[in-house]
Amino acid sequence: MKKFALFLILYIPTLWASPGDGGYAGAFLRMGFEARTKALGDAYTAVPEGAVAGIYNPATLPNLTSRQAILSFSFLPLDRTLDYVGFATPLAPKAKNGESGQPLEAGLAVGWIHAGVKNIDGRDGSGNHTEYLSNSENAFFMSFALKPSQYLSIGVSGKILYNRIPGITEDNGALTSSGFGLDIGVYSNPLPGLSIGIALKDNLSKYSWNTDSVYERGTSTTYEFPRIVRAGAAYRIPRQWLLVVADLETSDVQNPRYHIGAEFTAKELGALRIGLDHDTPSFGFGLYLQIFGKLATLNYAFTPGLEALTPEHVVSWMFDF
């Protein structure tokens, strides 16, 4: 079991890796975890809509038109789960009596992304089965943004990272690692219907593992997350029925990736979506519902499985209030 611990630390990231991801740390944050964004090819850096916008680009938050809560669940092959819960709100303080000019608009978001995998086949040094193991990764977000001008907003997002492998230490306890990451974003809407955004993601993000509780002579190892740069653009035609989005993603260790998508909206009914996450197509839809006079949206996304794997399904509930 002890010899298996280091293998787990190295192996688990590959379960979340997309093609070309290389199994780098933090892969669960780069694979898409919400149905609307997933169906749009994971291109969302320049879209100021919904609570999830604060994770893709925190600078979009002052441009939200309502408060929103969201629940999202991903159904993945290989006994994996990927879930997200979040809340976001625009902040528009009222001007005090006697003050000139408009108050500075802002936005706030919080969220939690949880990734888990179970039924990992544990083996001893002779290759004999010992037990089934599991792993969970978590990212807790808080994002804040300001809009200093009509056409420009800036934002920052801090995230606490926590990785846990239970039942693997000498006393059958958990091996854990924690860290902190920082995202920085800029957003602009220079023309009607057109928006652009840039996000610098996973600055400082890393896992530091110490295996003293597993081995007689443990080691300390650090795995840094790839530092991501995303630039995106979005355009909604004047009659509002079509949204076109595109992102270009690059990092300090990975090859560039592109993300494109389109959303066709039928007013008050729903939307159809199609996207391309680099070389992986995605499809989905949204249904608009009224619950107690408030807008609720049910979103679904479908992504074909890689090679022999089953397809991926993502379902999200969004509530505006």
Predicted regions and their residues:
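Positively charged n-region of N-terminal signal peptides that target proteins for export
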Residues: M1-F4, Q150
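Sec-dependent N-terminal signal peptides
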Residues: F4-P13
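A short, polar/charged loop/turn motif at coil->beta-strand junctions and beta-hairpin connectors
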Residues: L6, E34, N63-S66
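Outer-membrane beta-barrel porins/channels
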Residues: S18-T37, S74, T81-F321
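Intrinsically disordered, low-complexity, positively charged segments
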Residues: T37, Y44-E49
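Short strand-turn segments of transmembrane beta-barrel domains in outer membranes
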Residues: D42-T45, R67-L78
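N-terminal periplasmic accessory domains that precede
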Residues: V52-N63
